[in-house]
Amino acid sequence: MQLFHLCLIISCTCPTVQASKLCLGWLWGMDIDPYKEFGATVELLSFLPSDFFPSVRDLLDTASALYREALESPEHCSPHHTALRQAILCWGELMTLATWVGVNLEDPASRDLVVSYVNTNMGLKFRQLLWFHISCLTFGRETVIEYLVAFGVWIRTPPAYRPPNAPILSTLPETTVVRRRGRSPRRRTPSPRRRRSQSPRRRRSQSRESQC
């Protein structure tokens, strides 16, 4: 299995420190946390169950739909974009290597073991990594960190003393965005609506009075 990791390092395009952290930490067991520079930790993300994270395919589709132009840009957009670029490249190389192993490894048991290892261990780490950076770009890093802390507190609290439902990340920024975007229109829209709605009534009442 160490040879498998070594093949991953060789085949992975890792020109940045972020991607090097991701690969080297898995190979030699170095105490490197790819989330620390963003204010989170591997332990903090580990509170989220494995089935919480979407599949790699869904996460890649999301990243492509939302940030494809920025990811393909030669310019530096943000550390999250850089981390996403390298994670996507490494995942593509990993899939190429896994396909090669599946084709050339004659022993079915060994082949299934490799596939299972990739999907269970490395697949989960990539899902966590992709989810974290996509969420930070979508909702903001502070909101994501706040959510991770809130979920960690919730999951460690005994069921009798915690709310029945876990915190939901999507509800945090939506309330903020709605308030910020809704204040100015709500202050501006009532007066025209009242004027528009009152003017026909006045006209109708005046016409009725004239008719009487």
Curated annotation (Swiss-Prot):
SUPFAM superfamilies: Hepatitis B viral capsid (hbcag). InterPro entries: Hepatitis_B_virus_capsid_N (IPR013195), Hepatitis_core (IPR002006), Viral_capsid_core_dom_sf_HBV (IPR036459). Residues 165-212 are annotated as: Disordered. Its main location: secreted. The record marks 183-184 as: Cleavage. It holds the Pfam family Hep_core_N. One of its GO terms (cellular component) is host cell cytoplasm. Sequence repeats lie at residues 184-190, 191-198, 199-206. It is found in: Secreted; Host nucleus. Keywords: Disulfide bond, Host nucleus, Host-virus interaction, Repeat, Secreted, Signal, Viral immunoevasion. It comes from the Viruses. Residues 178-205 have a biased composition (Basic residues). Phosphorylated. GO terms for biological process: microtubule-dependent intracellular transport of viral material towards nucleus; symbiont entry into host cell; viral penetration into host nucleus. Residues 25-27 are annotated as: HBEAG. GO terms for molecular function: DNA binding; RNA binding; structural molecule activity. Residues 1-19 form the signal peptide. Residues 184-212 form a propeptide. Residues 184-206 are annotated as: 3 X 8 AA repeats of S-P-R-R-R-R-S-Q. Belongs to the orthohepadnavirus precore antigen family. HAMAP family: HBV_HBEAG. Homodimerizes. May regulate immune response to the intracellular capsid in acting as a T-cell tolerogen, by having an immunoregulatory effect which prevents destruction of infected cells by cytotoxic T-cells. This immune regulation may predispose to chronicity during perinatal infections and prevent severe liver injury during adult infections. This is External core antigen. It comes from Hepatitis B virus genotype D subtype ayw (isolate Italy/CI/1992). The gene is C.
